[in-house]
């Protein structure tokens, strides 16, 4: 089935710009890049977002906020230090909460390429504790969800503690024999699929199709995290 798409694909220009922001992650470089930030990054990402809405959210009648504050910011909230990120990401969220306080199906563009995945943690402290409770109450079910993806290439499962220079990560790229010890003390849990820069460019507009396939892959785990003790899920 052909998707209704307005996104035309990422261009080499966006990755070259993000390369420069990675090399000089500061507001001065951001200001130099402002035209490209709009034309090469933000506007195409909005069209990509619109395609997800038209082809996934609306047909499935999903109760997601798709307009307000679904995108991250390039400029860091670092108390005036002027730092700048080298990536931009987005996630829809349930209307009664906020993007950073919900379980997130994330879409991320960076100098390395594009990534789609699932994250719980950071400001979503209550949902992280709920997810951990679900994991340890049904470890076999959890491993089934995770390993189904880890058996394929370019999927990574990792936990993290801390942030910035103090962040530590425990990373797995192959099926797990047991729930990692790092899960219990984790401040965030990721399951993410990476698409290389070269493949992202080659996909063009079809990145939307690939991304939706990946969304469907993580959807059972998204529901697992949000299910209550009786296994019931709802938005």
Where are these regions (language model features)?
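Soluble, non-transmembrane alpha-helical interaction regions
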Residues: 8-10, 74, 143-148
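Short histidine-centered catalytic/ligand-binding loop motif
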Residues: 34-41, 130-135, 203-207
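Hydrophobic/aromatic-rich structural module bridging two neighboring secondary-structure elements via a short loop
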Residues: 58-104, 108
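Compact, glycine/acidic-enriched structural inserts
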Residues: 109-174
């Amino acid at each position: 089935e052909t998707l209704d798409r307005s996104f035309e694909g990422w261009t080499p220009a966006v990755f070259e710009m993000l390369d420069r922001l990675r090399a000089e992650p500061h507001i001065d470089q951001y200001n130099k890049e402002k035209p490209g930030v709009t034309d090469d990054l933000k506007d195409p990402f909005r069209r990509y977002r619109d395609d997800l809405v038209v082809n996934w959210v609306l047909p499935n009648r999903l109760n997601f906020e798709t307009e307000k504050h679904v995108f991250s910011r390039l400029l860091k909230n670092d108390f005036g230090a002027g730092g700048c990120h080298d990536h931009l990401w987005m996630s829809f969220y349930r209307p009664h909460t906020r993007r950073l306080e919900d379980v997130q199906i994330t879409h991320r563009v960076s100098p390395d390429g594009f990534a789609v995945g699932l994250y719980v943690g950071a400001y979503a402290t209550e949902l992280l504790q709920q997810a951990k409770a679900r994991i340890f109450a049904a470890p076999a079910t959890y491993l089934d969800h995770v390993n189904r993806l880890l058996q394929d290439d370019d999927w990574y499962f990792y936990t993290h503690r801390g942030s910035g220079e103090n962040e530590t990560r425990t990373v797995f790229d192959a099926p797990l024999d047991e729930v990692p010890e790092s899960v219990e003390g984790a401040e965030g849990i990721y399951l993410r699929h990476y698409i290389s820069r070269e493949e992202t460019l080659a996909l063009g507009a079809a990145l939307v199709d690939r991304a939706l396939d990946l969304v469907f892959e993580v959807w059972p785990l998204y529901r697992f995290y949000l299910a209550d003790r009786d296994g019931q899920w709802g938005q």
